[in-house]
Regions:
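Histidine-centered nuclease catalytic patch
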Residues: 1-2, 31
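Histidine/acidic-residue-rich catalytic or RNA/ligand-binding cores of hydrolases
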Residues: 6-9, 37-41, 128-136, 155-171, ...
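Catalytic domains of carbohydrate-active enzymes, especially glycoside hydrolases
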Residues: 14-26
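Extended substrate/RNA-proximal surfaces in nucleic-acid metabolism proteins
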Residues: 19, 32, 37-147, 151, ...
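Short acidic/polar active-site loop segments enriched in Thr and Asp
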Residues: 24-25, 29, 117
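Short acidic/histidine-rich active-site segments
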Residues: 31, 177-191
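Conserved short secondary-structure transition element at the edge of the structured enzyme core
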Residues: 165-183
């Protein structure tokens, strides 16, 4: 939402857009400190005041936490514990590329946190990853991997994202590791847009049973929310 500093809708505007797209649930995941202009950690201390249902759309509260060098998270545990779920991802604005092995090790270290349920956009060869290691870690630590529609829209910025997703999806299918497919909407007009991601899944024959957010109960069970 607006709170992240480079997005352009409020929570209620995002929920209204989700209703228009006939979505049952939306996750609001502001960027954690480390991204310019985003929220202070104190923001996560008062999430309870936000209605759990807006315009008939269920609201879950997450955070996209930055992977830092040394395998550290960019948000303190006391704030992470207030979330419904945490996402971890590498962002070049607050991370120095350590090569395939180092990047993968740092990401996996963050995935060990029990509140972490998702890895965001693991697709960009500007910070390359070892996909066999990543998928095996996702299986071990019960973390799902994201197929990010916005990455495919801006594929000129996400180096080799299509091929990286094909590699990742083949491994997820092999080892039965779940994924989420999402818009990564930073404006209400993008909420629910998953066209390129869904086309990619169809092109590789990906098993829909491994797509967590194809089924509301399956998604909520995985996230551990009621």
């Amino acid at each position: 939402t607006l709170a992240s500093g480079h997005a352009y809708g409020t929570i209620r505007e995002m929920a209204a857009a989700a209703k228009e797209q006939q979505l049952q649930l939306i996750g609001i995941s502001e960027h954690a400190p480390g991204i310019p202009g985003t929220v202070d950690p104190f923001y996560y201390g008062n999430l309870r005041v936000i209605p759990r249902v807006i315009d008939g759309v269920e609201i879950l509260h997450g955070c996209e936490i930055n992977v830092l060098n040394g395998g550290r998270l960019s948000l303190e545990q006391k704030y992470i514990d207030r979330l419904d779920y945490a996402i971890v991802g590498i962002h070049g604005l607050c991370y120095q590329n350590e090569g395939t092995d180092g990047n993968t090790t740092n990401l996996i270290e963050c995935m060990k946190n029990p509140k972490v349920k998702l890895v965001s956009h693991p697709d960009d060869d500007h910070t390359p990853l070892d996909y066999p290691r990543l998928v095996q870690a996702a299986l071990q630590y019960h973390v799902a991997l994201e197929v990010n529609n916005s990455s495919l829209v801006k594929k000129d910025q996400r180096l080799n994202c299509y091929q990286n997703y094909r590699t990742m999806l083949a491994l997820c299918q092999q080892y039965r590791v779940p994924i989420v497919v999402d818009s990564d909407a930073h404006d209400p007009s993008w909420v629910g847009r998953q066209d390129l991601a869904c086309a990619l899944l169809e092109s590789v024959g990906f098993d829909e049973e491994l797509v967590l957010n194809a089924d509301l109960a399956r998604l909520k069970s995985f996230l551990g929310v009621e």
